[in-house]
Regions:
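Internal helix-turn-beta structural module
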Residues: 84-92, 96-108
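Cysteine/selenocysteine-centered motifs that mediate thiol-based redox chemistry or coordinate metal-sulfur cofactors
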Residues: 105-117
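Short clusters of hydrophobic/aromatic residues that line enzyme substrate/ligand-binding pockets
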Residues: 20, 34, 85
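A long amphipathic alpha-helix within ATP-dependent nucleotide-binding catalytic cores
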Residues: 26-71, 112
């Protein structure tokens, strides 16, 4: 959110593949763990990497960077410049955990989009 990384969440799908159904169906029961269960050092590292990806890619507004954590290293999968904003989407869930109401999140996105850069 701007220059701030809101947080990291871990997803544990109960399906073989993390596909559309696993992402967007309440019946899929993908487990969301917030905050991601990482050491303080690793948590700060993944937030730093997300901010770095946002900056290097010259992104604006809200982005969501997806990582795999394997053998104690983070691997960037993608940076999503238009993350979902549904009831099951991750950005609103992470923002809520950080104390940011959905209406305030949307308000910030609209205001940020209106700035000329």
């Amino acid at each position: 959110m701007g220059t701030r990384a809101l947080g990291a969440i871990e997803l544990i799908p109960r399906r073989k593949f993390y596909d559309y159904t696993a992402k967007y169906s309440a019946n899929a029961r993908t487990k969301h763990i917030m905050p991601a269960p990482l050491s303080e050092k690793k948590y700060k590292e993944v937030l730093f990497l997300a901010k770095k990806a946002h900056k290097i890619l010259r992104c604006r507004g809200i982005t969501r960077s997806d990582f795999r954590f394997f053998k104690n290293k983070f691997y960037l999968l993608e940076t999503n410049t238009q993350p979902g904003m549904t009831k099951l989407s991750l950005v609103p869930e992470i923002a809520k955990y950080c104390g940011i109401k959905f209406v305030n999140l949307v308000e910030w996105i609209v205001k940020d989009a209106s700035y000329n850069r």
